[in-house]
Amino acid sequence: MRQVVLDTETTGLDIANDHRIIEIAGVELVNRKLTKNSYQVYLNPERTVGPSFKIHGLSDDFLSDKPSFKEIYEEFLDFIKDSELLIHNAEFDVGFLNHELKL
């Protein structure tokens, strides 16, 4: 069984306020054992990071030359394809991922 432990960082807590994903990270488990397969990307949110900088330390300047979600979504979907996703606070992360996929 393939599983992916997944986490995101965002510019804030609410997609209704135009907050965006700024980092996606995942590690692969096969039969509940960690493999060397992982995925990590920083993203340009195309907006300011704001006060969330105090939480994750990712600055506007650091993110300015990173790809947008639109530029990486296919490789991200390939990484998680055919996997059970293990996500702490899944409603939050999945909500943001679904929002990004609609943009």
PLM feature segments, named:
Residues M1-L103:
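Conserved non-catalytic scaffold segment of RNase H-like nuclease domains
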